[in-house]
A protein has these predicted regions:
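Conserved beta-strand hairpin/beta-sheet module of binuclear metal-dependent hydrolase folds
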Residues: 1-66, 221-247
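Flexible, acidic/histidine-containing loops and adjacent segments that form or flank the divalent-metal
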Residues: 2-5, 10, 90-237, 316, ...
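Divalent metal-coordination and catalytic microenvironments
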Residues: 9, 22, 40, 76, ...
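Active-site metal-binding motif and surrounding structural segment of the metallo-beta-lactamase
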Residues: 31-35, 46-100, 259-276, 290-294
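Active-site environment of divalent metal-dependent phosphoester hydrolases
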Residues: 44-46, 77-83, 106-109, 170, ...
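Metal-dependent catalytic neighborhoods of phosphoester/phosphodiester hydrolases
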Residues: 49-50, 82-91, 111-114, 281-285, ...
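Long, structured stretches of catalytic cores involved in phosphate-ester chemistry, encompassing
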Residues: 110, 258-332
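Long, well-ordered mid-to-C-terminal structural blocks that present hydrophobic/aromatic surfaces
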Residues: 229-273, 279
Length: 355
């Protein structure tokens, strides 16, 4: 049996995005003997310009003239993750079997918000408007099976998919804290506010073993709502983190520990939010030590923010191999057909890192 994963180049003009394709099973002797999964779809143009031609060329997944995708996973409803999935779902050349996605307009009740005038119906409309692209994806795939999401393990066509987070309560807390939603009730826990600059960065000389971390930098509530998924198949382990932040990742690591799930032996960890240092801290990164490779999805010209030089050097000290898309498709496989592609070099140490 075989497995392969591809992080496709998404974004331009300093704006990164996520689009991941995976397939496993018998990748040689018939299209019906493999399973194809797409995780996030990048921007509006990603489907037509990148993902669709890629699937046709490399995944051999056209059945009776349609591109067959067994499972689509939306990590969270940010534009750089969901927009391309909408275009894919609208395409008459595509057949999708199943979708895993949160639907906040179906999952939250008016009791989470202060405005006493909100009814269940009006809240559904407001959340649908707030997360318009995700709602559009839900609408155009209304006849496709969707799984109600919770932490736990799902057996899927010979593979194991474990949702490590978020729990339903933490997910609802994230949505209630989102800038796009009404003001949450007092009993709803506040998440740390987003801090950190997106402007030009300042650098300082790097000194081995002396990297400091600012735990006051945080990601957004909507990023914290990201699905964190451990995929396992035939000895392969891949951890997918969406744009999850420190709270979500810490919760997921704790859940894994309580349930005897190891995260220090993964083949690949897709690092959150294009390699932003705001999403992780040393204790989170230490939980991954022993795993093999870290993958980053980012454009090549991102003002130096993604991936973080501080993060790259910290993980180099932990002996990780690290790779990024940076305008190219990032591929890894086990027993997969040879594409004749060249190996890519992993990151070395930076001489300077962000202050």
């Amino acid at each position: 049996m075989a497995f392969e994963i591809d992080l496709l180049p998404v974004g331009s003009e300093k704006k990164s995005g996520d689009c991941i394709a995976m397939r496993y099973g018998d990748l040689v002797n018939g299209k019906e003997k493999q399973t194809v999964i797409v995780v996030d779809g990048g921007y509006v143009g990603t489907w037509k310009d990148t993902l669709k031609p890629f699937l046709r060329k490399y995944y051999n997944c056209e059945i009776y003239g349609k591109i067959h995708i067994d499972l689509v996973i939306l990590s969270h409803p940010d534009q750089d993750h969901v927009s391309g999935l909408v275009e894919m779902a609208k395409d008459e050349d595509v057949e999708i079997e199943m979708i895993m996605m949160h639907r906040p307009w179906e999952e939250l009740s008016p009791s989470w918000f202060k405005d006493g005038r909100i009814t269940k119906s009006s809240l559904k409309d407001r959340l649908g408007d707030a997360f318009g692209k995700a709602k559009e994806l839900d609408d155009v795939t209304k006849n496709i099976s969707k799984t109600r999401l919770n932490v736990g393990n799902y057996d899927y066509q010979g593979a194991s998919i474990t949702i490590l987070g978020p729990t339903p309560d933490f997910y609802k807390t994230c949505i209630a804290n989102c800038e796009k939603t009404p003001q949450q009730e007092d009993y709803v826990k506040n998440l740390p506010q987003t801090h950190g600059s997106n402007g030009p960065i300042e650098l300082e000389p790097y000194r081995y073993g002396n990297i400091k971390w600012d735990d006051n930098e945080n990601t957004s509530a909507i990023n914290e709502s990201s699905l964190i998924i451990l995929f396992e198949y035939d000895g392969v382990k891949v951890l997918l983190t969406g744009d999850a932040g420190k709270k979500g990742l810490t919760n997921a690591i704790n859940y894994a520990h309580v349930n005897n799930i190891t995260l220090n032996d993964c083949n690949i960890i897709k690092m959150p939010h294009h390699g932003s240092r705001k999403n992780v801290n040393p204790s989170i990164m230490d939980a991954f030590v022993g795993s093999e490779m870290l993958f980053y999805s980012c454009v090549s010209d991102d003002l130096g923010h993604h991936p973080s030089k501080r993060l790259i050097n910290f993980m180099k000290e932990k002996r990780f191999k690290q790779y990024s898309t940076s305008g190219k498709t990032l591929h890894w496989g086990k027993n997969a057909p040879d594409r004749g592609w060249n190996d890519v070099s992993d990151y070395g140490f930076y001489n300077e890192i962000e202050i």
